[in-house]
Regions:
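Short charge-dense sequence patches
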Residues: 3-8, 22, 26-27, 40-49, ...
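A glycine-centered beta-loop-beta connector
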Residues: 30-33, 38-54, 97, 105-122
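A generic helix-loop boundary/linker signal
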Residues: 16, 20, 46, 66-67
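The conserved cystathionine-beta-synthase
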Residues: 17-34, 41, 83-101, 108, ...
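Tandem CBS (Bateman) regulatory domains
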Residues: 1-13, 52-83, 89-98, 114, ...
């Protein structure tokens, strides 16, 4: 079977966040880009976490109920992030996505520099295109 690699189907321009960004700004980025999650990066483009729409929504609802100060991205981001490499197999990633919860995976190089993201939708598109091509290599 032809090797479908992550780098061929990943989003090279994902929505990204910084740890000091306020949640309102993160929400606005989600609304503008219509993406459901994104990597949190430091000033050197190193992956340090991941923020989802759900994380932001949960905090914003809590803020309404308790009239609290909105948090920063660093307060909400997940620090233990599942990542993939650009040379990883899309098929294997699809199988991993069926077992694990993340719908979006950051794509990083061997030094953990962010290269992009790949979503469940990207994986579905890759497999669909492959099947429609009649397995031609």
């Amino acid at each position: 079977m032809e090797s479908l690699q992550v780098k061929e189907y990943m989003n090279h321009y994902p929505v990204t966040f910084t740890p000091d960004m306020v949640v309102e700004e993160a929400a606005l980025r989600f609304l503008k880009t219509k993406q459901i999650g994104g990597p949190v990066i430091d000033k050197n483009n190193q992956l340090i976490g991941f923020l989802s729409e759900s994380d932001v929504l949960s905090k914003m609802i809590e803020t309404i109920y308790y009239n609290e100060h909105i948090a920063d991205v660093a307060d909400l981001m997940r620090k233990d992030v599942l990542t993939v490499k650009p040379y990883d197999s899309v098929i294997e990633l699809g199988q991993q996505m069926l077992k694990n919860k993340p719908k979006v995976y950051p794509v990083v190089d061997d030094d953990e520099n962010l290269l992009g993201t790949i979503s469940r939708n990207d994986v579905l598109r890759a497999i669909d295109l492959h099947l429609r091509s009649g397995y031609k290599g």
